[in-house]
Amino acid sequence: MTGSKIILASGSAIRRELLTNAGIKFDVITKPVDEAAIKASLLNEGASVRNIADALAEAKSVRVSAQNEGLVIGADQIMTMDGILYDKPISLAEAKNRLMKMRGKTHYLIGSVVISEAGHAIWRFMSKTKLDMRPFSEEFLDQYIEAEGETILQSVGGYRFEGRGSQLFSKVEGDFFSILGLSLLPVLDFLRDRGAISK
């Protein structure tokens, strides 16, 4: 093992938890990226959701990589439903309204992971998961929001799939880790190939 330094360019608690639980030693370094401006510019150019997620993940990764040695992991996730792109809800009221719209419907999570070194992207992985929400009652939703609190504001969908949020769904097609925001298994494969972690 070469012991290449691994850096996570994300403040996401669940991404940190996934890497930690996998036994990976890493540092967390984040640099602000104007996600709204990048997204607006790409939408104006007619970019696909996949390209937008990829550009955001790359921007986060490259920005940190330009000033720090090692392999820098950047990630982004975008939710789409009925052709509309969604950002993280900013309040519990907004989260409730969104979840009410989502019940009984299908939405997609488009994810990208980009690993950079010396200021350049050297690896990327895209994921797409399809999630069907069950037609839950408003009473259930109120209980869910009360139990979860503001933790649901950390997710673009307004749910923590790894927790009580799993009760919102009737069917899911795709990778569990990708739903949480980091396609962990492909990332681990790349880190092994690079000798950053043991084979």
PLM features: what roles do these ranges have?
Residues 80, 114-117, 134, 171:
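Short beta-strand-to-turn element immediately C-terminal to the catalytic PLP-Schiff-base lysine
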Residues 15, 78-81, 86, 116, ...:
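Short, active-site-adjacent cap segments at secondary-structure transitions
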Residues 19, 57, 76, 95, ...:
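Residue-level signal for inorganic ion chemistry
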Residues 1-71, 139, 146, 192, ...:
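N-terminal polybasic phosphate/anion-binding patch
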Residues 25-36, 114-120, 153-166:
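Mobile beta-alpha loop/short-helix "lid" or hinge segments that flank ligand
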Residues 77-107, 133-135:
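Active-site-adjacent loop/tail segments of enzyme domains
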Residues 100, 112-116, 120-124, 128-129:
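Anionic-ligand binding region
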Residues 124-198:
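Active-site oxyanion/phosphate-handling segment shared across diverse enzymes
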